[in-house]
């Protein structure tokens, strides 16, 4: 593992140059073969539901996932496995929202490290997915991301990385627009162990200081 100084965009530009000059394969989503693999997640969604969802909510950083999912839904529909296509709803962190703002963000900043990207390499494909699906891009704040992050942990027992929670934060923000009876899928893109410090820093004081070594106290916190 090699650490490169600067942000994601600078690091990606560097490794692209390295890959162009040396016998190295870049497996970032700039690589079309990666998208071909990622698109199969859309197949799995349709297989699980029996049809494409009405909305597909997804975090957007480098925009590879939203590009790949849209590819997958279209291919599966053409193959006769579904009758409809979802609205592609992409959510970016407010401090790193180039697709929402319409321009590159030179110094992206967000707690959601996986989408802390100011110049997504798949931006044109993502814009196409939004346009073709009648979808939308929207920014969510770090506070909204953390709220959704905690909700997923406490309500669903899912420990995801902060970037993943952006899809749920976005759905919460847009919930009034969801048609009655609609099927909505939120994609969680990464495990919480990718960014465990967020769980520690954003937990309540009981996690930091510990509970008194008392059976009743511990049982109460556990909900008994």
PLM features: residue spans?
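Active-site/ligand-binding loops adjacent to catalytic centers
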Residues: 1-33, 75-159, 201-224
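A structured beta-alpha segment of the ubiquitous adenosine-cofactor-binding alpha/beta core
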Residues: 27-50, 77
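Short glycine/serine/threonine-rich phosphate/pyrophosphate-binding segments
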Residues: 35, 62-69, 96-100, 163-171
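Glycine-rich ThDP/TPP pyrophosphate-binding loop and its adjacent helix/strand module
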Residues: 39, 45, 49-71
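Beta-strand segments within the central parallel beta-sheet cores of soluble alpha/beta enzyme folds
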Residues: 54-56, 83-92, 182-187
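Short glycine/threonine-rich catalytic loop with a Thr-x-Gly-x-Asp
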Residues: 60-64, 122, 156-164
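Catalytic phosphate/nucleotide-handling subdomain of diverse soluble enzymes
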Residues: 168-224
């Amino acid at each position: 593992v090699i650490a490169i100084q600067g942000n994601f965009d600078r690091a990606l530009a560097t490794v692209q140059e390295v890959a162009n000059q040396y016998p190295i394969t870049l497996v970032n989503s700039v690589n079309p073969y990666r998208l071909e693999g990622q698109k199969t997640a859309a197949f799995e969604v349709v297989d699980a539901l029996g049809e494409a969802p009405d909305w597909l909510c997804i975090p957007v950083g480098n925009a590879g996932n939203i590009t790949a999912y849209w590819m997958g839904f279209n291919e599966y529909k053409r193959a006769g496995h579904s009758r409809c296509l979802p609205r592609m709803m992409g959510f970016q962190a407010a401090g790193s929202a180039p697709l929402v703002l319409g321009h590159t963000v030179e110094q992206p900043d967000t707690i959601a490290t996986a989408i802390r990207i100011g110049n997504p390499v798949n931006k044109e494909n993502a814009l196409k997915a939004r346009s073709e699906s009648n979808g939308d891009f929207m920014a969510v704040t770090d506070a909204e991301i953390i709220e959704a992050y905690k909700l997923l942990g406490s309500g669903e027992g899912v420990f995801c990385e902060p970037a993943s929670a952006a899809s749920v934060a976005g759905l919460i923000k847009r919930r009034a627009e969801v048609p009655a009876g609609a099927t909505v899928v939120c994609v969680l893109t990464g495990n919480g162990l990718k960014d465990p410090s967020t769980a520690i820093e954003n937990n309540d004081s009981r996690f930091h200081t510990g509970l008194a070594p008392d059976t009743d106290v511990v049982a109460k916190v556990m909900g008994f």
